[in-house]
């Protein structure tokens, strides 16, 4: 402990011996401006742009008054600036009547939207029973079509087995080729059947029209 104290004292003594030989540095004070308004040099590159505008002139007038040499009339906004300020005030600070009218229009729009939504829901609910019937009919037709296709394919497979004359694997290439040929003939037969039915229906319609109009079926005029 004593050794550490002596060491600290020796360091302090060394510092004390070095202190008189050192010289402290004191920066000079900044130059004082003359009392009164100060106007920056427009030609100086270090001059801020805002110091050359009306904002700086207004600050000088606010600090020094008439001694600043600023005409009070020049601090008022121009007619164009005044119109811009009024438009900005109307946009960001609307009057009470304007806000009330805006709220009224907003509430009317929301009420109209709510009524339209309720009307749309009511119309959809009124159509719901018929939509359910249509959906059930579509499901039934889809099921009937699937059953008919299944029966048709089973019949064609039976015909293919009969034509081959022996049991064959339905997945074999020969069986699939024969099945495709039978399906093609079946589609052709159905198409011809539809065309025949259309022709018969057209002929029946023409015959009915001729029976209702005796003049049309009579002999040609001389």
UniProtKB/Swiss-Prot annotation:
Compositional bias segments (type: Basic and acidic residues): 188-201
Residue ranges, compositional bias (Low complexity): 202-216
Locus of motif Nuclear localization signal: 184-200
Keywords linked to the UniProt accession: Cell cycle, Coiled coil, Mitochondrion, Nucleus, Ribonucleoprotein, Ribosomal protein
Pfam families to which the protein is assigned, alphabetical: CR6_interact
Positions of region (Disordered): 14-40, 188-222
Subunit comment: Component of the mitochondrial ribosome large subunit (39S) which comprises a 16S rRNA and about 50 distinct proteins. Interacts with GADD45A, GADD45B and GADD45G. Interacts with NR4A1 via the NR4A1 AB domain. Interacts with ATAD3A and ATAD3B.
Protein family according to the UniProt entry: Belongs to the mitochondrion-specific ribosomal protein mL64 family.
Protein name: Large ribosomal subunit protein mL64
């Amino acid at each position: 402990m004593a050794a550490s104290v002596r060491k600290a004292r020796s360091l302090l003594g060394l510092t004390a011996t070095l202190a008189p030989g050192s010289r402290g540095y004191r920066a000079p004070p900044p130059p004082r401006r003359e009392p009164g308004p100060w106007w920056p040099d427009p030609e100086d590159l270090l001059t801020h742009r805002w110091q050359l505008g009306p904002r700086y002139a207004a600050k000088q007038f606010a600090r020094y008054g008439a001694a600043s040499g600023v005409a009070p009339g020049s601090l008022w906004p121009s007619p164009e600036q005044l119109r811009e300020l009024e438009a900005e005030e109307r946009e960001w600070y609307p009057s009470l009547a304007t806000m009330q009218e805006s709220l009224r229009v907003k509430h009317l729009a929301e009420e109209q939207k709510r009524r339209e939504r309720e009307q749309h829901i009511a119309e959809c609910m009124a159509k719901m029973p018929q939509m359910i019937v249509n959906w059930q009919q579509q499901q039934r037709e889809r099921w009937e079509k699937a059953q008919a296709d299944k029966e048709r394919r089973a019949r064609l497979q039976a015909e293919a087995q009969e034509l081959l004359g022996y049991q064959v694997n339905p997945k074999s290439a020969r069986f699939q080729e024969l099945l495709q040929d039978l399906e093609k003939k079946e589609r052709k037969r159905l198409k011809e059947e539809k065309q025949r039915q259309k022709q018969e229906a057209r002929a029946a319609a023409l015959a009915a029209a001729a029976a209702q109009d005796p003049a049309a079926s009579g002999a040609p005029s001389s």
